[in-house]
Regions:
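Gram-negative bacterial Sec-dependent N-terminal signal peptides
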Residues: 1-21
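Glycine- and aromatic-enriched membrane alpha-helices
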Residues: 22, 183-188, 291
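Outer membrane beta-barrel
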Residues: 22-44, 57-177, 191, 200-204
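Gram-negative outer-membrane beta-barrel proteins
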Residues: 41-49, 92-98, 129-133, 178-182, ...
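Short, surface-exposed loop/helix-turn segments at secondary-structure junctions
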Residues: 52-53, 100-103, 292-296
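Repeated loop/turn-to-beta-strand initiation elements of outer-membrane beta-barrel proteins
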Residues: 81-84, 117-121, 166-170, 205-210, ...
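Detector for outer-membrane/organellar transmembrane beta-barrel domains
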Residues: 189-300
Length: 312
């Protein structure tokens, strides 16, 4: 089955910078409040073609929330270069309404212990290293399907990060069982457990990233459902011009059924003037089972303008 998605999206996106305001700083304890208001006005026309080359057209327009959030970060210095840290972040998009401003919910909530020499370990509702495994400029649209290969977040995650070498970040995480997302919506299928390891490396104009993850899903039966995924991302700057490439490979097994899938997503970004850039991305994804094959094509073109140092 071949699935082609052609979309024209005209948007106006406004986001205030997530600047932090220090509300307390005394005796080794620092408390910061931060947040941003993110609104998007969009008009979208979309065509989906099926295997018989028949198209279905949908149109949509909205002025909506695009991930507005606020949070509090706490850090307390301990003895011997160690420190305790924690973060609580709230968002508003727990709703089915078109404006996406709904009930407040906790998107992130974690605590941990860290040291510059040995790294940080954190526990709770947080991102995993897989969230950093893309460099495409796609803002709100989540163009790169990396979360379908390795979970990019979880409600019960233990994560370790080491940044003791300049330009290098090493990370590992373990996800405990999860049957609902941060909003309380059921995951289908639920996650029994998962783990991932990854590395981010920057030197000069080169940005290279790599991660591997293994996920076991809930089945409610004696057979297993698991997914092994590899993500990679490369970026290189040529002055004001940046080329990126995001890649993913996954091998999924449900009982005796197997699916192999991959995606390739080249992209670019050009800083036309200090306040504005243009960008574009292309996505090709293929999933092949024992009796069927699904191909997906997608593209995204955009431009942004920085009206103020705190408004894009």
């Amino acid at each position: 089955m071949k699935k082609t998605l052609a979309a024209l999206i005209v948007t106006a996106f406004a986001a205030s910078a997530a600047n932090a305001a220090v509300v307390y700083d005394n005796e080794g304890t620092k408390v910061e409040l931060n947040g941003s208001l993110r609104l998007i006005m969009e008009k979208a026309d979309k065509k989906v073609y099926n295997a018989a080359n028949q198209s279905t057209k949908k149109a949509n327009s909205a002025l909506r929330n695009a991930g507005s959030r606020f949070g509090i970060t706490v850090k307390h210095n301990l003895d011997n270069d160690f420190y305790a840290l924690g973060r609580l972040e709230f968002r508003f998009d727990d709703t089915t309404s078109r404006d996406k401003f709904g009930r407040l919910y906790a998107k992130r909530a974690y605590v941990g212990l860290g040291s510059k020499a040995t790294g940080d370990i954190t526990f709770g509702r947080q991102l995993t290293i897989a969230d950093d495994l893309s460099q495409a400029v796609d803002y709100e649209y989540g163009f790169i399907p990396k979360s379908e290969y390795i979970p990019t977040a979880g409600t019960g995650v233990v994560r370790y990060d080491y940044k003791g070498i300049e330009g290098l970040q090493l990370s590992a995480n373990y996800n405990f069982g999860q049957t609902n997302d941060e909003k309380g919506n059921p995951l289908k299928p639920g996650i029994k457990n998962a783990y991932a390891v990854g590395a981010l490396y920057t030197v000069g104009d080169l940005d290279a990233r790599l991660a591997y993850g293994h996920t076991n899903f809930e089945t409610g039966a004696s057979y297993a459902h698991r997914l092994d995924g590899v993500l990679a991302s490369l970026g290189y700057k040529f002055g004001d011009f940046t080329l990126t490439g995001d890649f993913g490979y996954g091998h999924e097994k449900l009982d005796d059924a197997k699916v192999n899938k991959f995606y390739v997503a080249p992209g670019f970004a050009y800083q036309v003037v200090p306040a504005s850039k243009v960008y574009g991305n292309y996505l090709y994804e293929r999933a092949k089972g024992e009796s069927d094959k699904v191909k997906t094509h997608g593209f995204l073109l955009g431009a942004d303008y920085k009206l103020h140092k705190q408004v894009v």
